[in-house]
Amino acid sequence: MTHSLRVIFAGTPEFAAAALAAIHEAGFPVPLVLTQPDRPAGRGMKLQASAVKRYALERGMAVAQPPSLRRAGKYPAEAVAALDLLHATPHDVMVVAAYGLLLPQEVLELPRHGCINIHASLLPRWRGAAPIHRAIEAGDAETGVTLMQMDAGLDTGAMLHEARVAIAPDDTTATLHDKLAAAGARLVVDALVELERTGALAATPQPADGVTYAEKIGKHEAALDWRKPAAALARQVRAFDPFPGGAGTLDGATLKLWAADAVPGRDDAAPGTIVDIGPDGVVIACGEGALRVTQLQKPGGKRLPAREFLAGAPLAVGQRFAPADAA
């Protein structure tokens, strides 16, 4: 099936690429794709194209990669060129998903139907940069995807559609990301079909209550504070997989802890102390309960199941991870 609604797409990572793929496969014309400039990545730090750019180029779509869209910003010449291109490209709506650049008012007002954002949370909860991580970290039972009509604020626009997704007890940011990317892709296609058919989408202002912000994830957040309850640390490990992981310092070496669950602990063990080692994992005392770590990684090594890790790097009951503030 082909459609007449012309969609400019702006996005960068895999989450956005899933939406672009769904829009393209549904038959909507995409006359232009905006994505971030190529960035150094990987161990060799070679320039790599974004997931959105790779998908678009493989299908012959026009791609632009301005470092900014602000005329008065750090890259005025590049911004002006990109804005001229947007003005010269006939389109009806812009879909934005994890693009990574601020859209000035000029861009928000350019499409006939405005700019629709795909946000990976149930707004107004978890506005901001890291909604998937923060939902898991906080212990939310569910999250979802919200389509909103973009305005000048940070994820403050009126809500158009939403899809709810349960957070499974073993979900990591990686697995939940994929569920939400698929949900967002379906949601935006349904919305575009409705927009083409009816000419407008019903918009509901976000409620004033329940607003929270999902701050960007920092590498420093990997450090596990063993004084916390084991359940909170297990959520932290899941929330920070694949980045930045959970981390603990043992005898001066920083170990990455990639998979863990909360188990009953011992009252006589200081937080951070290894209280049991077995084929099922390494059990570490916490402020409340204990954390059973089932996947570990030593510096320069690979992620390994506990059994394989211990075969090459034995640990002992009684060893103690350094406090987070001393690591």
Curated annotation (Swiss-Prot):
Binding site for (6S)-5,6,7,8-tetrahydrofolate: 121-124
Principal EC category: transferase
MF term (GO), any: methionyl-tRNA formyltransferase activity
Gene3D superfamilies noted in UniProt: Formyl transferase, C-terminal domain, Formyl transferase, N-terminal domain
GO cellular component: cytosol
Domain of life: Bacteria
EC number: 2.1.2.9
Record keywords, A-Z: Protein biosynthesis, Transferase
Matches recorded under InterPro entries: Fmt, Formyl_trans_C, Formyl_trans_C_sf, Formyl_transf_N, Formyl_transf_N_sf, Formyl_transferase-like_C_sf, GART_AS, Met-tRNA-FMT_C
Family: Belongs to the Fmt family.
Function: Attaches a formyl group to the free amino group of methionyl-tRNA(fMet). The formyl group appears to play a dual role in the initiator identity of N-formylmethionyl-tRNA by promoting its recognition by IF2 and preventing the misappropriation of this tRNA by the elongation apparatus.
Name this polypeptide is given: Methionyl-tRNA formyltransferase
Organism of origin: Burkholderia pseudomallei (strain 668)
High-level lineage: Bacteria, Pseudomonadati, Pseudomonadota, Betaproteobacteria, Burkholderiales
Gene name of the record: fmt
